[in-house]
A protein has these predicted regions:
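Midchain, well-structured core segments that form catalytic/ion-binding scaffolds
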Residues: 1-90
């Protein structure tokens, strides 16, 4: 099954990372976790400028484990990074 997942954080200027919640950092942890699952990340889109922390990152994943397993994995990681997520099944 194909899913599109949006991770939302708090964007900001790269010189003030203390004021942001970087969804790219969160995604790095998600990516690491997904390596142990039946998931294959097929697309990543996040950030538009070198000196800006983005407010969101969108990635696509093929998963045979289903949406509930994705939610189970994403919830604690996103909470740790002060981010939220939304899963779409286009």
């Amino acid at each position: 099954m194909h899913y599109s997942i949006t991770i939302r954080g708090r964007g900001g200027h790269g010189s003030r990372p203390d004021r942001a919640h970087n969804p790219i950092d969160c995604f790095a942890a998600v990516f690491s976790k997904f390596q142990s699952l039946n998931c294959h990340i097929t697309r990543v889109d996040g950030g538009t400028a070198a000196n800006v922390i983005p407010g969101e990152l969108i990635f696509c994943v093929e998963s045979g484990d289903g949406e509930q397993e994705l939610v189970r994995c994403l919830t604690p990681i996103c909470k740790l990074y002060h981010c939220s997520f939304e899963i779409e099944c286009p």
